[in-house]
Amino acid sequence: MASLGANPRRTPQGPRPGAASSGFPSPAPVPGPREAEEEEVEEEEELAEIHLCVLWNSGYLGIAYYDTSDSTIHFMPDAPDHESLKLLQRVLDEINPQSVVTSAKQDENMTRFLGKLASQEHREPKRPEIIFLPSVDFGLEISKQRLLSGNYSFIPDAMTATEKILFLSSIIPFDCLLTVRALGGLLKFLGRRRIGVELEDYNVSVPILGFKKFMLTHLVNIDQDTYSVLQIFKSESHPSVYKVASGLKEGLSLFGILNRCHCKWGEKLLRLWFTRPTHDLGELSSRLDVIQFFLLPQNLDMAQMLHRLLGHIKNVPLILKRMKLSHTKVSDWQVLYKTVYSALGLRDACRSLPQSIQLFRDIAQEFSDDLHHIASLIGKVVDFEGSLAENRFTVLPNIDPEIDEKKRRLMGLPSFLTEVARKELENLDSRIPSCSVIYIPLIGFLLSIPRLPSMVEASDFEINGLDFMFLSEEKLHYRSARTKELDALLGDLHCEIRDQETLLMYQLQCQVLARAAVLTRVLDLASRLDVLLALASAARDYGYSRPRYSPQVLGVRIQNGRHPLMELCARTFVPNSTECGGDKGRVKVITGPNSSGKSIYLKQVGLITFMALVGSFVPAEEAEIGAVDAIFTRIHSCESISLGLSTFMIDLNQVAKAVNNATAQSLVLIDEFGKGTNTVDGLALLAAVLRHWLARGPTCPHIFVATNFLSLVQLQLLPQGPLVQYLTMETCEDGNDLVFFYQVCEGVAKASHASHTAAQAGLPDKLVARGKEVSDLIRSGKPIKPVKDLLKKNQMENCQTLVDKFMKLDLEDPNLDLNVFMSQEVLPAATSIL
C-alpha cells in the first residue's frame, strides 16, 4: 500500500512504506530459498500409507495396492498361491499395509488367514485394518468400468474414449481377471474413504499418477528374523525425534553402510531392493555392469558429477499430487525446475557413456524432449524471486500484457496517491495535521488521518463528506468521494492480478500434468542410477569384488570372504573361504570354543550371499553364487513380551520355518540350536533336524550349523557320508591362554574351552578351576568329590548317618510307616545337612 504523511505545518511529505493496520492480518513471513528447501525435505519424509486390496480364488491371487507417497497404484498379475497363502504373507511382510481390503464373500482359507492377521497382537502398531466390502463391488464388469472411466492426470484430455481404452490396456492386464477385480475394489475403497482428499470438495477425486506392475516370481525368500539377525536393517532411536518423523534412524547395518544415495527416492529404491533380493540373472548382471563401469578410475569424475545432479532430484510425485489437488506451493515450482534441469543434465551425460549398458541407454532415450518443454515453460513463466517475495505464484514480465499493465499501475500508485492525499488534505479541517491515502486488497482505497485528542466518543469520528470505516492504531479510516472514484477507476488491482496469475498457474499445471508420465519415468531411472552409484562408491571404499552367477552351481563358493560390518569394527579381520557346491558337504557342522568366530562366519556367508542377490559387489576376493531361492536362519532369538513365547519356543519356530520350507536350493544357517533347554533334549532335537534333512539325500538344503554340542560328533549321532562335513575354528593353547586364529579348517574341536571363556568373563579363578575339575571328572567317569572348604561342620558325617538309616530300612516290614520315618528321621537330618 502507499501512504502520504503531512507534518503539523500541513506540508505533504513523500510516500513512505505503508503497513496494514492492526485490524487486518499481516502477511506471513516470506520463506527464503533455504527455508523453502528445508520445507521440501520435511515433505519428503512424510510417512506413506499403503492400502492393499486382495482376492484369492481357485488357487490364484489378485493383488493391488495404493501408495500415498507417490500416488501410484501397484498391481501384481494373477499369481498361483498355496492354500497357506505364503505369497500373500510375503507381500504383507514387504509392504506393511495400513489396511487390507477384500470381498465379504471370500474363501474359507482367506477368511481364516485374515482373521489370524487381525489377531496378531505382536504386529502392533503395524497391524493392518481388515476391511470387507460387498462382493458386488468386485464384479468384473463394474471393475473394468471403474478403471476405464477414471480421471487420470497422466492421460491427455485430447484422447478419445477408444484411445483411452487402448492406452490403459497397454498398462493393465485386463486378461488377469482377479487383478482387474482387485483394482476395481481398490478404486471403490479409495473413493469411499477419500484417501488423501478427506477435507477437499466431493468433486475432487483421489489423485492417481500412474499404474505400476510388480512381480515376486524371481524373489529370494527371506523372513524378518533373518533381516534382523544378519543386521541387514537395524533401527535405532534418533537422538532428536524432531529430525525424523518416526523418531528412528538406521544403526550399524548393511543398509546403513551401503546407503550413500543422494536423493530420497534412491534411498527408497535401495530399501526396496534389499527387501526383494532376486535370482533373476539378467537383472543382477545389469546392476553389476553399471557398478563395474563406475569403479573404473577414469570414470570417477563422471560418477561424482552424476551424484551432484542426483542431489537435485526431489519428490516429483508429491509435487504432481499437489498440482492435481491445486495445492501447489511456491517452493514446488523451483524444486520441479531444478529437478527437470538436473534430469536433462543426466540425459546429456548418459548420452556420452557406453550405450551397451542398459541403464545409460534407457536414460538417454526416455528422458525425452518433454523435459525441455517443461523446463522451458517454467523458466519463461515463473518469477521465482517475485514468488518467494510475495509468498505466492507470480509470473515474469511479457507473459500477459494485461497483467503487466496492471502491475505498472499498481507500482505507480505511491506517487499517484501522494497527489491524491495532497488534494484531500486541502479540503480537511485545519486541525487535522496530516493524512494519507492507502490501498488495502479486497477493501480498496481509504483516507487515513490521525486521531485528534478531541475525538473521544464514536460520534466525534464523524466528518462531513467522509464515511467512517474503522479505527486502528489511533488512525481513523474513511471513504471519500476521491477514494470511491479511485475504486471505480482502478478497481482491486491486487486481487485482479492475483486471479489472472492463478489462472496462468493452472494452465501451467495442466501442461506439466499432461507430461507426468515422463516425470515419473525420470524418477524411476534417476533413483536406479543413484542406487548403483551408491553401491559403486561403497565397493570402491571397502574393496569389494564382482560376484559371478552360475545357475549350474548348487550352492555358494566364496574365496577369502569377509564380514562387511565386522571388518569395519575390528582392527584386523581374518578372511575365510566357503565351499558348499555340489552333492558333497551340503551339511557343515562347525565346532569350536566360544568367541572363536563361529557366529561371525555364519553371518558372513549369509551376508555375502544376500549382497550378491541384490546386485551388489561383495567383500571377498571371489564369489560364485548358484541358484539360491531362500535364506533361513536360527542365530538369535528375537524375544518380545508381546509374543507370549519362551526363548526356546521362538528357536523352535525359526527352525520349523526352515524344516517346512527349505528346498535343495535354500541356504540354512543355524547357531547354537538346542541350548535353550535340557542338554540331552537340545542335542536330540538338533540331531533329529539334521538327520531329517540328510535323509533327503542330494535334495538336502545347504546347511551351516555352529554348535558347542561336541557329543553330536563324539556319539556319532549323524550318519557318515559325503553329505556331512565337519569344520572347526582353529585355536592354539599357549600355556594357560587360548589363542584364537579365527580361521575355519576341517576337523572337530577337542574341547569347548569353556573355562577360558569364563576366565575372560571375569569369574574368580577358584570357580574356573573347580568347573574345569568337575568337567574332567565327568568326562572320565570318575566320582565328583566335594570341596571340603565349602562344607559345613560335620556335614559329611551327617550325610553318612542319613545314608545308613536308609540302608537299614526294611521296605518289606509290614509295620513300616514311611510317613513317620520321613518326618521323624529324614527331615531333621536333612535340615542339619542343608
Curated annotation (Swiss-Prot):
GO molecular function: ATP binding; ATP-dependent DNA damage sensor activity; double-stranded DNA binding; mismatched DNA binding
Residue numbers spanned by region Disordered: 1-44
One GO-annotated biological process of the protein: chiasma assembly
Keyword terms: ATP-binding, Disease variant, DNA damage, DNA repair, DNA-binding, Meiosis, Nucleotide-binding, Premature ovarian failure
Domain of life assignment: Eukaryota
Effect of D487Y: In POF13; decreased function in DNA repair as suggested by the persistence of gamma-H2AX foci following cell treatment with etoposide
DNA repair keyword on record: yes
Consequence of changing I703V: In POF13; uncertain significance
Tissue-level expression: Widely expressed, with high levels in testis and ovary, including granulosa cells. Also expressed in fetal ovary and adrenal gland.
Protein's UniProt keywords contain Transmembrane: no
GO annotation, cellular component aspect: nucleus
Quaternary structure (record): Heterooligomer of MSH4 and MSH5. Interacts with HJURP. Interacts with REDIC1.
Family to which the UniProt record says this protein belongs: Belongs to the DNA mismatch repair MutS family.
Protein name (database record): MutS protein homolog 5
Source organism per UniProt: Homo sapiens (Human)
